[in-house]
Design a protein with these regions (language model features):
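Short loop/turn motifs that connect adjacent beta-strands in outer-membrane beta-barrel proteins
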Residues: 1-2, 24-26, 33, 71-78, ...
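Detector for outer-membrane/organellar transmembrane beta-barrel domains
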Residues: 51-134, 186
Length: 188
């Protein structure tokens, strides 16, 4: 089905801020989505003007993704995901779009009526690196940049489902780790 949504996030210090809009369509396990991601990341150009889409000064990038959930048809708890930045602040040194790309595979290692535990592996590359970019893409450098473990609890409050999750991610490229905690408050 068709989904239109908003997503936002920050870190505990307020150094990272994000506010996104998306449109997605899912049918028979396939999902196609377009995301408008507006964020502030230290070390990157930042515009406080949320309506600024000039590629040289914007804080936006537009992302096109496709995904397939093998569980839908084949009952295999594997999900594959591909996303490429097609517009915005993903520029090589010559000022052209790099088309930075993120690919990911996730597999559910445990499921019951209340819990889902997933492991994942993701990597990045760019289709249009500039001559002096040295293998750089929007996310860092080409290679593995996400090893993850996510636990989701299917919280039920009355007749409402509100999945709660904790997602630990390690980035070998940047030698950092992240913890994301969230709840899906509503979906329609």
């Amino acid at each position: 089905g068709l989904k239109v949504g908003l997503w936002g996030g920050t870190d505990f210090t307020g150094d990272y801020k994000e506010f996104d809009y998306y449109l997605s369509y899912t049918i028979a396990g396939f999902t196609v989505a377009v995301w408008d991601i507006y964020n502030y990341s230290p070390g990157l150009p930042y515009s406080k003007d949320i309506f600024n889409y000039n590629k040289f000064s914007t804080s936006h990038f537009l992302d096109l993704s496709v995904a397939y959930n093998f569980d839908t048809k084949f009952e295999v708890p594997l999900r594959l995901y591909w996303a490429t930045i097609f517009a915005g602040r993903d520029l090589n040194l010559e000022g052209r779009n790099r088309y930075s790309t993120y690919v990911n595979a996730e597999y559910s290692v445990y499921r019951d009526e209340h819990w889902i535990v997933d492991v994942g592996l993701g990597g990045t590359f760019a289709f249009n690196r500039g001559d002096g970019d040295g293998g750089a893409n929007f996310y860092g450098y080409d290679g593995i940049d996400q090893i993850s473990l996510r636990a989701t609890y299917k919280l039920k409050l009355g007749r409402f489902d509100m999945p709660v999750f904790a997602h630990a991610m390690w980035n070998p490229d940047q030698r950092q780790g992240y913890l994301q905690v969230g709840v899906n408050l509503f979906a329609f």
